[in-house]
């Protein structure tokens, strides 16, 4: 006897999907992610607020034993940015983290070197002829190896990689279908966020002039993403600036003056335009792809 009794089976639980945010919200998320990552070292450093004597000892740049481990906490933005961009990419863009540039390929090291070389070239070529306008050589104030470690940590792990992962990785992926718009938006937001950066500015007007430099090298970095399909040249530009300033301090070269900021910005802007022209001559692309 055939049993024709059919019972309604309970529906399988629906997979919870994070709602996709509108484009404007995903764009404005970029500066928030960048700021959270930038201030993340306060988390591992927070216990020091209860021990002011220990904090003073660790913050002494002449104290190599103490300052070196404290410098390692400045690498926390890399950890924070990786987590935040992973969360944003997988939940809001529904794409893997590697699409934002968090990958290392055979080409990555060379591309990082290109960014480093460009940053050194622009930094020194635009500063050396204008030393008469500079305000003094930067004082390292610490043993050489600590200064080098500080430049690498700040240039790569505190600023270079996390900021480029957010601004050139996440943000340009949000706008991936409009490459030139992605370049423009990431450049403007990156530049504006540097208004409160400390670079030797002595007035509100100088703060505006100072913005030209990070805005220009942000433009150059974004152009490199289109041409090379990688964020590593941009990371190299960031790290190269810090290492170039360290080398300049050792050589007696100064970099702080409105004239140098403006000339340096012109140097990065010209380099960015050249990179965009190369990208266009190679056929351009209809979307931002990061796979190297």
Predicted segments with their positions:
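Short, highly charged, low-complexity non-transmembrane loops/tails of multi-pass membrane proteins
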Residues: 5-10, 59, 285-292
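Small-polar-interrupted transmembrane alpha-helices in polytopic inner-membrane proteins
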Residues: 156, 179-195
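C-terminal membrane module of polytopic membrane proteins
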Residues: 239-292
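Hydrophobic alpha-helical transmembrane segments
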Residues: 24-32, 71-72, 109-117, 149, ...
